[in-house]
């Protein structure tokens, strides 16, 4: 069988600069600006992983974000330590929480925030094994 490895997340945005600034402010993303095919491109690194931001032109046939919940890709998760402090920091920065911090089962604490373009982001802490 072939070997598969994780490569990236791809986000479409009407305002890539604002989207990148949000992830940088909220999650400490490293914003990487470059040129591709003569056009500006914005990518990010979050937790060592690649996140690409594709611009959505004003006049395009790209649909708006769906109403949640919906089928298909639901969210991506960012693991942290000291989640109580992280949640307090995110609230101080104005993050919009769609699910407050809770413990769905022993050893895991989670919450969800809504990012630009309606992207759902889980922030979680797993107890050491």
Region roles according to the model:
Residues 1-5, 30-77, 88-114, 126-129:
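Vicinal oxygen chelate
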Residues 19-24, 90, 118:
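Conserved active-site tyrosine of GNAT-family acetyltransferases
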Residues 123:
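Short glycine-/small-residue motifs
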């Amino acid at each position: 069988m072939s070997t598969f490895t994780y490569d990236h997340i791809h986000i479409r945005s009407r305002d890539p600069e604002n989207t990148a600034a949000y992830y940088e402010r909220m999650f400490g993303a490293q914003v990487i600006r470059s040129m591709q095919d003569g056009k500006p491109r914005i990518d990010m690194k979050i937790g060592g992983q690649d996140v690409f931001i594709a611009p959505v032109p004003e006049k395009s046939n790209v649909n708006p974000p769906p109403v949640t919940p919906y089928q298909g890709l639901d969210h991506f998760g960012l693991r942290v330590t000291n989640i109580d402090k992280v949640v307090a920091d995110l609230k101080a920065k104005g993050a919009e929480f769609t699910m407050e911090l809770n413990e769905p089962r022993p050893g895991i604490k989670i919450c969800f925030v809504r990012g630009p373009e309606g992207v759902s982001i889980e922030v979680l802490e797993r107890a050491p094994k």
